């Protein structure tokens, strides 16, 4: 069993019910971000599912230099602070450099380490020293057991408020595959484990200048992952994914979310 950690008004891990981490891939603008957060709240309140709101202020590893990256650190954190204060939701976003850590920690409940940066010791240590919860996405290039070394870096820096997230493993060119064995393997380290069901169906760089995705498989993979007894599921959502400025092909339409969450909640209740 994993340890229980508090994230704002949400508790994750141990024998706690499944937690949802959800939101748009990137902050497109303030209005759309707040509207998405409000819709998510309405959905989860009807299902009694704990929610942590996710949106990136900067997508620093987009495929193309011309791709939309977001509003940036200062404006993005202002918008996330507004979501947090107006709706009472814990918030999470990516950090990409040690310079971003302190300002991000003043707003965010969870500092997220992107998969491509999961071995960057200086970034892990700086994030750990804030005392914030640190969510590390397992690199597409890492074996699940290699994440124990990542955990060790954070713990050695005085922080045991850790979440580990599986988001697929590279499988040839422009493709990812989900190995469900990684979930119980990482849970053995004693910290909550989350499955990122939307990035796991991403086709990195699959559209030439941007990534593709296969959102039709999100439900199947998330159901399988929840059946292993994980602590949370991570879903990027959008009102109109085909018009999204980032990761639309693998995002879940908000209109489809209630049905999916009902299924995941039922599976979680059985396995826990």
Curated annotation (Swiss-Prot):
Where does this chain mainly localize?
cytoplasm
Q: Which UniProt keywords apply?
A: Cytoplasm, Lipopolysaccharide biosynthesis, Transferase
An example of a GO molecular function for this protein is: 3-deoxy-8-phosphooctulonate synthase activity
Q: Do you know which Gene3D superfamilies this protein is assigned to?
A: Aldolase class I (3.20.20.70)
| Source organism, top-level taxon | Bacteria
Q: Which GO terms describe its biological process?
A: keto-3-deoxy-D-manno-octulosonic acid biosynthetic process
Q: Which EC numbers does the record give?
A: 2.5.1.55
**Coiled-coil ranges from the UniProt annotation:** none
**Cellular component per GO, a single term:** cytoplasm
Q: What name has this protein been given in UniProt?
A: 2-dehydro-3-deoxyphosphooctonate aldolase
Organism of this sequence:
Geobacter metallireducens (strain ATCC 53774 / DSM 7210 / GS-15)
């Amino acid at each position: 069993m994993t340890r229980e950690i508090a994230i704002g008004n949400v508790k994750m891990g141990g024998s706690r019910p499944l937690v949802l981490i959800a939101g748009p891939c990137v902050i497109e603008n303030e209005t759309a971000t707040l509207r998405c957060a409000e819709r998510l709240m309405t959905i989860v309140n009807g299902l009694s599912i704990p929610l942590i709101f996710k949106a990136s202020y900067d997508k620093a590893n987009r495929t193309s230099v011309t791709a939309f990256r977001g509003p940036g650190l200062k404006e993005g954190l202002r918008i996330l602070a507004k979501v947090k204060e107006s709706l009472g939701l814990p918030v999470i976003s990516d950090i990409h450099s040690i310079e971003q850590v302190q300002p991000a920690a003043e707003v965010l409940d969870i500092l997220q380490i992107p998969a491509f940066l999961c071995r960057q010791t200086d970034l892990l240590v700086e994030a750990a020293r804030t005392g914030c919860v640190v969510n590390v996405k397992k690199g597409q290039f890492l074996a699940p057991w290699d994440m124990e070394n990542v955990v060790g870096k954070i713990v050695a820096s005085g922080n045991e408020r850790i979440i580990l997230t599986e988001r697929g493993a590279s499988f040839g060119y422009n493709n990812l595959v989900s190995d469900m064995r990684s979930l119980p393997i990482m849970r053995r380290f004693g910290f909550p484990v989350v499955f990122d069901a939307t990035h796991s169906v991403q086709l990195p760089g699959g559209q030439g200048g941007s990534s593709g995705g296969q959102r039709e498989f999100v439900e199947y993979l998330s159901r399988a992952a929840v059946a292993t007894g994980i602590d949370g599921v991570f879903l990027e959502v959008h009102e109109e994914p085909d018009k999204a400025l980032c990761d639309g092909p693998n995002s879940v339409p908000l209109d489809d979310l209630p049905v999916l969450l009902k299924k995941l909640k039922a599976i979680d209740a059985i396995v826990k």
